[in-house]
Amino acid sequence: MGRIPTRELSSYLLTGRVFSRDCTRLQRLPARNISKQHFAVGQPAQRRWNHTAPEAGHTTTTQPPPGQPAPHLRKILKDQAKASKAQAKGKKKRSSADNQTVPGWELTVGIEIHAQLNTDRKLFSPAPLASTEDNTRAPAPNSLVAPFDLAIPGTQPLFQQATLVPAIRAAVALNCAVQPVSSFDRKHYFHWDQPSGYQITQYYAPLARDGYVDLRARDGIAAQDVGGGEPLRIRVKQVQMEQDTAKTLARPDGVHWLDFNRCGAPLVEIISEPDIHHPATAAAFVRKVQMLLGAADACVVGMEKGGLRADVNVSVRRVEDGKTSSAKLGQRTEIKNLFSFKAVEDAIIAERDRQIKLLDEGGVVLGETRGWSLGSTETRRLRGKEGEVDYRYMPDPDLGPVLVGQDVVEHLKSTMGVMPDQELDDLVSSYGLSEKDAMSLMLLEDGGRLQFYYKTVDALEQRLQNQGDSTKVTAESLVQARILTGNWILHVLGSLTSENNQRDRAAAGLSERDLGVTSEGDAFISADDLADILFFLHTSRIRQGTAKDLLFAMFNEVMPAQYISTPAGIERYITDNDLWFSELSPQEYSELAESVLDEEEHVLKEFMGARYPQGKLMFLVGMMMKSGARERIDPATAQKVMRDVVETRVAAMK
């Protein structure tokens, strides 16, 4: 085959057009009639391949039939989950806690985690990568490719050194020993998403070895793994760099398109030792690894956005009188491409139960690769397990060894950010948050919700310090403000994206919207605006209901733009709409409490004998809220006044 002209090569890279010559000569496929049998359940569609590139801006993975709008991905997933639940409706489902063990059997799990490195370069080509932050502007398919990504004959890999730094950070975060010399190898297999016929990875000499991850009860491990106050240590066998594959865009008619923008993206593969014996602990391990990689700035896109996926290797063996029946582990199966923590736990439970049932019936577990779908109750066979011989690993002759000096490793260690365990302890001790709330902040939006929390707290504390000398800001007041901020960012902000509010937006002609939280802590509602609302709420200048109304008004685009993200904008909006809290005077509180007791005097006998049942007291407070001007009543003050009035009346009755 002769040299390909530059014009034809450019046309192929940019538009997907292949000129008919030599081995690239196109053959016309015979036309086939499409009948109902092509869509029968259980009959796979025939695959056809086109050289035509998809139109720019196409980002979905499926193409609808002509004339029909593309279904929303969320709707597809919900429909699949509902269908799976309907099929399993008659089956009794055990709770997660009950599903961690099966009497008479030991589960063993090893995990391989693939995470995309935080860099804008591909591993072996100069082509850029799509931004991990701007999800609203996806690049056109096949627009971020270089000749090497397409395995054009004559092209060679060029190791991009910028990808090495986040990889070393990942290894350090996992307590691994970074190897002074590592090398790249070819893993041979044939699939349409790998045009070269092999993947470049690190099999014989990986980047790092012998690490570990410590898990505690607060990380969500199984109750059976909690004990003695000591953390559960999961060993990390190795960390290696490797290429990602192209993305397949599948259509219902059996045609598949390939997007090579992702081909060659730098990944780290993290391989654990088979130290995990409970499904919940496996999910906790993946969750903890994601947090560690994010804190190290090695991988900033987590499972929520597809930047991290897990493969789990599952095996079982019998246990008799607390001892395993064999020193050798059972035959393992691999479940590929799990994209959520819940999927990791559920897939392991399903595969464990399948293997146990098979062995109880006298069957044999085969070494194979299996898949898992959202909402499923069973794993499904994908293919027979390929052994090491099938991959034909060999050193890559086009790439030299990677040399890493110890001084580089020490420098990266010294510049690492705060690790998750230390940060969680600080959130609990200094910010007053519960471990559960602190963990939620650290996990949501790949840590972006926590950064938004920090920004809001800083802005709120600045407002409290600047409010004047008339009110002293105490340490206790600051902690209460931090707790208030955490509750709002976790719970109240979450209600903005509830189904009820989304229906209200749709009724108002507005499109569905999420919070828009980025990894830097930015969001549709700015931290400054939220801090303004919380400042007025914390200082009792507005009520809880008013504060929520302000938040919803901003999110649902009811509040005019001139009040949003402007100095004192929230304060002006409250003033212009007369929303300030004008509390009752002490005399008005007392008069209201007296009038309520006049109507409910029969309740007083419940308080005789120095007994003050809280339920009865709150009933009277509720009557105060109902009888008076609710927007002017502080519940805490009303409770105190009502208690004083009750004590006075009870004393007079003696």
From Swiss-Prot:
Keyword Transit peptide listed: yes
Gene Ontology cellular component annotations, sorted alphabetically: glutamyl-tRNA(Gln) amidotransferase complex; mitochondrion
Gene Ontology biological process terms in this record: glutaminyl-tRNAGln biosynthesis via transamidation; mitochondrial translation
Pfam family, one: GatB_N
Region Disordered, residue ranges: 79-101
Location(s) in or outside the cell: Mitochondrion
Predominant place of localization: mitochondrion
Subunit-structure text: Subunit of the heterotrimeric GatCAB amidotransferase (AdT) complex, composed of A, B and C subunits.
NCBIfam families referenced in this protein's UniProt entry, alphabetically: gatB (TIGR00133), PRK05477.1-2 (NF004012)
This protein's name: Glutamyl-tRNA(Gln) amidotransferase subunit B, mitochondrial
Organism of provenance: Pyricularia oryzae (strain 70-15 / ATCC MYA-4617 / FGSC 8958)
Classification lineage: Eukaryota, Fungi, Dikarya, Ascomycota, Pezizomycotina
